[in-house]
Amino acid sequence: MSASSAARRPVEAMLGLSIREVSQALRDGKVSATELCRKCINQIQRTRYLNAYITIAEETAMEQAERADKRLRTGKTLGPLDGIPFSVKDNFCTENIKTTCASNMLKGYVPPFSATVVQKLLDQGAVLVGKTNLDEFAMGAGSTDGAFGPVRNPWSYAAPYREQSAEDPDSDWTITGGSSGGSAAAVASLSSFLALGSDTGGSTRNPGSLCGVVALKPSYGLLSRHGLIPLVNSMDVPGIMTRSVHDAATVLRILQGRDERDSTTVQAPNTPPSLPEHFDMRKICVGIPKEYHAPGLSEDTLAQWSRVADIFENAGARVKEVSLPHTPYSIVCYHVLCCCEVASNMARFDGLEYGHRSAVDSSTDAMYATTRHEGFNNVVRRRILSGNYFLLKSNYERYFVKAQQMRRLIAEDFKKVFSSGIDVLLTPTTLSDAARYADFITEDNRTRSAQEDVFTQPVNMAGLPAVTVPTALSQRGLPIGLQLIGQTLQDWKLLTIAHWMEKQLHFPMIRFHRDLNENEREQNRSIRERTHTVGS
C-alpha cells in the first residue's frame, strides 16, 4: 500500500500502517498527531483485556501530540517519528512517569530522568502513550510472572485462532512470550506503532516471534543502556519492536551511537538513510546451524525454516549448513551467568534509597530481609539465591569461571562461521508457536525460560545483532517467526537481508475475530483490577 492511498483511508485504518506510511499521512495533513494519539489511546482501552500496559500516559501523550501538530503545521518537523505514538517496556526509566519493572519492589516509583533511548525518541517528536507489562524485573519468557498479571497474545483473539476454538476466549488464550510481552502485544494489537523492549537472552525476539511483529536485538554497545534497569549488564540490550523491518531500521538509526553515560557504547557505523528496496541475493551466503534442530522443534516451525531457506536459495543465495558445536551447552552457561549478575544487580534494592520498604523495624537486618521478601516474587528470589550460590568462594571456579570460559567458546563458534564466508545465519526464534497460558504455567519459570530461550540466548552471549521476522501462521492460526543473526556491528546489513526476506513472505495483518462485548470487557476489567488498575 502506498503512503498516498493509505492517507486517504479513515483514521481507524491508519493504526495498522507502517511508520513510514503514517508519517507521510501526518506531513500531508491527512491526519493530525492528536487524532492519531487519541486513536491509539482508544485502542489501548478497547484491548485492555490483553493487559499489555501497566501505565497509560494519556495526559502527557496528548500534550506531546499537540506540540507535534504545531510543528507539522509549520513544516518544522523533528524527523520521521514526529507525532508517532510509541510505548516503552516498564523497565526503562521515564521522567515523571512510573517505572515499576512489574514488581512490588518498585510499585509507584517515579524516576527523575528518562533512559537515553526513550529521550532520543522524545527528542524526535515521538509520542509516549504508555509503559508496557513484563515479567518481574524482566525475568521470564512468557510475560506471566509480573506483579500486574499475565499479558495475553492478541492473536488469541484474531480470526485464524478463534475460528478453530470452541472455548471461551477468556479461558482459551495464549502467552505473548517474554519478557517484553507487553511491548509485543502493544505493537501487534495496533495500539502503538513501535515499542521498546529489552533483550538479555531473547526477551525482545521471543515475544516478537510469538506475536507476529519484527523484533530487533542490536549489537551489544550500539544502543545505550543508560536508564534501563539492569538485569545482566554484560548481555542487556534495548530492543526495537515494529510491524516492519523498514520501521525497525528507521528507529535504529535514531537510537544508535555513543552515550557518555554508558561506557559500553560504541560509535555507530555510517548507514544510508534507508534500506534498499532491491537487493541482489546472489552475493549472500546464508548459514543453517545444524545444532538448532533442537528437541521439541515443532513441525510447523521446521516447515517454515525449510521454506524460507528454499526462498533464499531460489533467489540465488548460497545456503550452507554450518556447525556451532558449543550451542548445546549455551542455555546452562547462560543460566549461571544470568543468575550471578542478577544477584549483584538486585542487591541495590534494599528499601533505603527508593522503592518498597517494609514496616518491620526491629532491626536493620530484619527490615532489609523483609523488604526483599515482600518486594520480590519467587522467581526473582530464586535467581538471587542461585547467583549467590554460584558465586560462593567454594563454587566460583566450578560454576562462574567455567561458564565464562564456555561463553568465550560460544562466541568463537560464531566468529569461525562468519569468517568462513557466511553473511547471516537463519534459525528458528522459538521451538513452536505460542503456548496456551493454561499449559504454559504447568512448568516452573526456570524450565519455561530454558525452553523458550534455547535459540536466542547464544546471540546475547556473543554480543551479535539478531532480528526475528514473522513468516506465516501455524496450523493453529498463530504467528511463527524466524531469526536472522548477523555479525557484530553489521546491523544494517542484517536488516537489509531481513527486509528482502520480509517482502517475500507477505505475513498477514492481524484481524480480530470480534470486539469483546461490554459485559466481557467489564469482566476483564474486574479481573485486571483484582491485580492492579492500569496506572496504579
UniProtKB/Swiss-Prot annotation:
A GO CC term assigned to this protein in UniProt: glutamyl-tRNA(Gln) amidotransferase complex
Keywords linked to the UniProt accession: ATP-binding, Ligase, Mitochondrion, Nucleotide-binding, Protein biosynthesis
EC number(s) per entry: 6.3.5.7
Catalytic activity annotation: L-glutamyl-tRNA(Gln) + L-glutamine + ATP + H2O = L-glutaminyl-tRNA(Gln) + L-glutamate + ADP + phosphate + H(+)
Molecular function GO labels: ATP binding; glutaminyl-tRNA synthase (glutamine-hydrolyzing) activity
Organism domain of life: Eukaryota
Gene Ontology BP term (one): glutaminyl-tRNAGln biosynthesis via transamidation
Major enzyme class: ligase
Main location: mitochondrion
Annotated catalytic residues: K89 (charge relay system), S179 (charge relay system), S203 (acyl-ester intermediate)
Localization: Mitochondrion
Protein purpose: Allows the formation of correctly charged Gln-tRNA(Gln) through the transamidation of misacylated Glu-tRNA(Gln) in the mitochondria. The reaction takes place in the presence of glutamine and ATP through an activated gamma-phospho-Glu-tRNA(Gln).
UniProt similarity note: Belongs to the amidase family. GatA subfamily.
Self-association and partners: Subunit of the heterotrimeric GatCAB amidotransferase (AdT) complex, composed of A (qrsl1), B (gatb) and C (gatc) subunits.
Protein name: Glutamyl-tRNA(Gln) amidotransferase subunit A, mitochondrial
Organism: Danio rerio (Zebrafish)
